[in-house]
């Protein structure tokens, strides 16, 4: 039978002196501090019931290093299976139980039946026989029926259960050339799927000593022998713990089988080991060592009255949409003699705040002269709150050729691309000022403004442009986003055809993180929302996906290529293509408005409500 997930495995069992120790009295007496262990045990057992695991950690002067935001991720009620890697032994089980109990009182650990002889552990544990290879394996199956039923009943009553699916302590894996858990049992996944419990990934940073790993290579039983000594050497240790977002039971249930669910839980757990990591990359390090060109000082603010006059002078038909607070206008740069300078200044301020930006005093370029500018205007404060830049590809290519498109600076296009997608509207340089980013309404109105612009120009039903993934995201987050869309593009015939006509000028290549298979996790994700959760786990500030990426996905966008923009703070640009004729009708009507949507449908001979 597969080895069951436990806490501590054989760790505490040395206190009951199993045959291995009794058979090696001289060796054990020389290398294993049994007397020290017994004295610790006596002090811990004197603690009040319910506090003995805390007493154990207190006696050892072990401290947790865990972010408060991570502690807030522990569900305070409802059935919960906390899954964790198992790097140390005794320490892991005690630490995880105490950590969970700070958020909720109903915590138990699935642990080794050898520890059942220690009565003080009964209040904390459900005991199972973990061994998979023994002459008594069938007896183990019988012995585990009752405790596993007990575990399921505990979860169905709304309790929390701590599980170490590896079933034994992490050790050196020769094939992977690192210390890691052995393969995980599927028991944790089965408990989640059978009880409807949420799953909580928890990662312990670190591992046991090099001597422990070496002894395990000589004989795995030597690891067991020295687990107690390893624990006693953890005195005054600071244990770094990372907690991921709780995984809804339905997500686990939707995976194909217990094996796939187990793989997902393991990947989500080990993903936490990369939070905040900056992978080693020789080119990146070399660039970092070079003197950087200093950023220019931000341009002076344009006097408000000049900007107000520019907006007031726009023809009435340039108003695309408005609500009580904001209005969205369409204008050419020639109609904005003062406002265009303020627009460039605000762009640069906003992009710099997001770790991007040109480094110039204002973000203005040659494309601004002949592109449309969709302006988000705060009616009460009389100020620009954000903007989009939009260009009709047919007109631009006629006047300037393909090189007249902004995205041609980051992607090389085959002329066949524009024959395939037809008349389109290139979007880019979008921003909402930082002080307006706390609410979603400004960006939503901008998007409605884009839709109204398309409704007024229905001959351009395709949107395309570059959506940025800033370098404020970790390299692994950016790689996961890229890999997710690349995997889906392979399955999308149109996406593959588009990709064949596009070439990134500087292809994005993520620095490799040793022994992490990014594609394995991405292949288990069904939609963009399921990608957002692991991204949030990776990012130290907990941010999810870039909001524009989600917005494009909502209207059916395909990401067909990725480029690293060296001139724009090393952001990753994803080239997105959206055919609004294929967008969900209810979504499109919400953005275009009923009249605009009806006119769009008439122009393209679309039946309302059908794609």
Label each residue range with its predicted role.
Residues 293-334:
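Conserved N-terminal entry element of GNAT/NAT acetyltransferase domains
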Residues 366-375, 543-544, 569-574, 587:
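A short helix-loop-beta-strand connector motif used in the catalytic cores of GNAT acetyltransferases and
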Residues 348, 358, 394-558, 563-573, ...:
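Acyl-donor binding region in acyl/amide transferases
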Residues 382-387, 425:
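Glycine-rich phosphate/pyrophosphate-binding loop shared by adenosine-nucleotide-utilizing enzymes
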Residues 1-86, 93-95, 102-106, 122-123:
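Membrane-anchoring hydrophobic helices of lipid-metabolizing enzymes
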Residues 320-373, 377, 385-389:
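Short amphipathic alpha-helix that is part of the acyltransferase structural core
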């Amino acid at each position: 039978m597969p080895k069951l997930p436990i806490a501590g495995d054989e760790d505490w069992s040395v206190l009951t002196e199993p045959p291995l120790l009794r058979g090696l009295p001289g060796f054990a007496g020389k290398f294993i501090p049994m007397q020290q262990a017994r004295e610790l045990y006596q002090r811990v057992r004197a603690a009040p019931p319910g506090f003995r695991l805390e007493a154990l950690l207190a006696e050892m002067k072990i401290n947790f290093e865990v972010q408060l935001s991570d502690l807030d991720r522990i569900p305070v009620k409802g059935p919960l299976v906390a899954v964790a890697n198992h790097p140390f032994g005794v320490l892991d089980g005690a630490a995880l139980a105490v950590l969970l109990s700070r958020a909720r009182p109903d915590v138990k650990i699935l642990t080794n039946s050898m520890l059942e002889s220690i009565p003080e552990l009964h209040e904390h544990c459900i005991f199972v026989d973990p061994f998979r290879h023994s002459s008594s394996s069938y007896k183990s199956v019988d012995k585990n029926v009752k405790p596993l039923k007990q575990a399921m009943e505990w979860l169905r009553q709304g309790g929390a259960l701590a599980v170490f699916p590896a079933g034994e302590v992490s050790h050196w894996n020769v094939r992977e050339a690192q210390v890691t858990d052995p393969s995980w049992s599927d028991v944790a996944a089965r408990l989640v799927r059978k009880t409807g419990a949420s799953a909580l990934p928890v990662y312990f940073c670190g591992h046991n000593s090099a001597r422990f790993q070496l002894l395990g290579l000589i004989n795995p039983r030597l690891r067991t022998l020295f687990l107690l000594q390893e624990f006693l050497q953890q005195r005054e240790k600071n244990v770094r713990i990372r907690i991921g977002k709780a995984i809804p039971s339905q997500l686990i249930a939707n995976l194909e089988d217990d094996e796939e669910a187990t793989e997902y839980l393991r990947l989500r757990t080990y993903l936490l080991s990369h939070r905040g990591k900056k992978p080693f990359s020789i080119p990146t390090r070399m660039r970092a060592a070079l003197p950087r060109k200093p950023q220019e000082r931000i341009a002076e603010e344009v006097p408000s009255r000049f900007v107000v006059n520019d907006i007031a002078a726009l023809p009435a038909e340039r108003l695309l949409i408005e609500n009580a607070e904001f209005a969205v206008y369409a204008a050419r740069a020639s109609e904005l003699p003062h406002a265009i300078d303020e627009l460039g200044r605000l762009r640069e301020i906003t992009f710099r705040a997001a770790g991007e930006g040109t480094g110039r005093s204002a973000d203005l370029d040659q494309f601004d002269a002949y592109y449309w500018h969709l302006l988000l205007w705060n009616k009460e404060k009389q100020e620009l709150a954000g903007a989009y830049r939009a260009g009709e590809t047919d007109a631009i290519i006629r006047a300037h050729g393909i090189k007249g498109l902004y995205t041609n600076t980051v992607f090389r296009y085959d002329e066949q691309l524009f024959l395939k997608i037809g008349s389109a509207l290139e979007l880019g340089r979008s921003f909402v000022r930082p002080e307006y980013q706390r609410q979603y309404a400004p960006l939503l109105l901008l998007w409605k403004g884009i839709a109204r612009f398309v409704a007024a120009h229905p001959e351009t039903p395709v949107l395309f442009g570059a959506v940025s993934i800033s370098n404020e995201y970790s390299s692994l987050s950016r790689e996961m986003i890229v890999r997710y869309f690349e995997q889906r593009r392979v399955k999308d015939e149109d996406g593959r055809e588009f990709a064949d006509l596009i070439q990134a000028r500087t292809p994005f290549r993520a620095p490799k993180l040793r022994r992490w298979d990014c594609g394995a996790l991405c292949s288990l994700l069904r939609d963009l929302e399921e990608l957002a959760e692991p991204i949030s786990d990776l990012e130290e500030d907990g941010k999810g996906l870039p909001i524009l990426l989600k917005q494009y996905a909502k209207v059916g966008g395909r990401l067909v290529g990725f480029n690293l923009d060296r001139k724009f703070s090393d952001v990753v640009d994803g080239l997105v293509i959206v055919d609004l004729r294929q967008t969900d009708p209810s979504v499109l009507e919400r953005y275009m408005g009923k009249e605009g949507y009806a006119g769009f449908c008439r122009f393209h001979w679309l039946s309302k409500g059908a794609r």
